[in-house]
């Protein structure tokens, strides 16, 4: 059956389109509009809506296998579809760790029929221990799209060098969790005035940036493709900007909480505002916003990290790091468009086109013959995010009760409706 998305604003930066137009879909692909509309065609009237390539979140923790009490592939992809995402890349810090082809295959088999596509990311080191390399060829053959020890830094520079060399030989992307652990040890929020007032041990921005600089140096040495995860500070941005000027194969992401919140959110010892890297000051927040606009940062990803209530309802120092983000990312990111920081086309690049290119996966465009992964957005829809009504099992969000403007109203995966608001 032909599906017609009629009269929406089609924003497709890869094909340089930003115009009111119709999108036709059939058999899981985008097709060229026909002269006559078939009688059995399903038509959606989307006047006033944006029609964009399906959003892709390249940094998600689905917690499956092993920690399904926090999240599962089913609940995580349900939350993704509700947030407008047609695909997610899931991190390997599961139980067991995704460091073999068998775990990669389990994830892909369990994700069949899910509300969004799932792209497994394999571990850089066995067990995420940073001691020996994992089986890259085995994981790639099974379907892994990239490699990372996310959640843990690779402390050994020698091991990271070998990891990049091995990854390059298999044409695999390396994603870095950039953290110098001797500088961040026992820290639980940004080092600064707020931490001093609260009596909490801080984590300096240099704990992130010094490792970003190391990773960039090793990428230059090895020629490996490097992606810096969850960038939070000015110093990291400077290093990334310089790497790009030198033509190194380096890309980077940030998350909505880093351009929406500051470390003031921790006042009151709110554990829902605890994540790693931590929220920084207003100066860093503004720099992140500018870096999204000028191309220093390539991707908006959520770092969706669900936890159970008991893991957050403890004293701040002992609370788990991370927040859920799949259902708030789009609304928070659209604020950058309203503020004049981003154009709608640039936002689609950051949340769809560029993630697809970095991960070397299908999607990120609406050209004829492309997969029919499509997100429909109502940029004017005002709504209040309530964590109790969310689809994720995680209840850890500092945005609970926030009034947001703009949301996904329809999500299509391979031409099939996976979410309707």
From Swiss-Prot:
Per UniProt, substrate binds at: 61-63, 93, 276, 307
GO biological process annotation, one example:
purine nucleobase catabolic process
**Keywords tagged on the record:** Hydrolase, Metal-binding, Pyrimidine biosynthesis, Zinc
Q: Write down how the cofactor binds this protein.
A: Binds 2 Zn(2+) ions per subunit.
Query: Which residues hold Zn(2+) 2?
Result: 150, 177, 230
Q: Which family does it belong to?
A: Belongs to the metallo-dependent hydrolases superfamily. DHOase family. Class I DHOase subfamily.
Q: Which GO terms describe its molecular function?
A: allantoinase activity; dihydroorotase activity; zinc ion binding
Entry keyword annotation includes Ion transport: no
Protein's recorded name: Dihydroorotase
Q: Which SUPFAM superfamilies match?
A: Composite domain of metallo-dependent hydrolases (SSF51338), Metallo-dependent hydrolases (SSF51556)
What does the UniProt function comment say about this protein? Answer: Catalyzes the reversible cyclization of carbamoyl aspartate to dihydroorotate.
Per UniProt, Zn(2+) 1 binds at 59, 61, 150, 303
Gene3D superfamilies reported for this sequence: Metal-dependent hydrolases, Urease, subunit C, domain 1
Cofactors that this protein relies on:
Zn(2+)
- Give the record's pathway: Pyrimidine metabolism; UMP biosynthesis via de novo pathway; (S)-dihydroorotate from bicarbonate: step 3/3
Kindly identify the residues recorded as the active site.
Answer: 303
The organism named in the record is Desulfotalea psychrophila (strain LSv54 / DSM 12343)
The record, for InterPro entries, names:
Amidohydro-rel (IPR006680), DHOase (IPR004722), DHOase/Allantoinase_Hydrolase (IPR050138), Dihydroorotase_CS (IPR002195), Metal-dep_hydrolase_composite (IPR011059), Metal_Hydrolase (IPR032466)
Q: Which GO terms describe its cellular component?
A: cytoplasm
* Enzyme Commission numbers on file: 3.5.2.3
Catalytic reaction annotation: (S)-dihydroorotate + H2O = N-carbamoyl-L-aspartate + H(+)
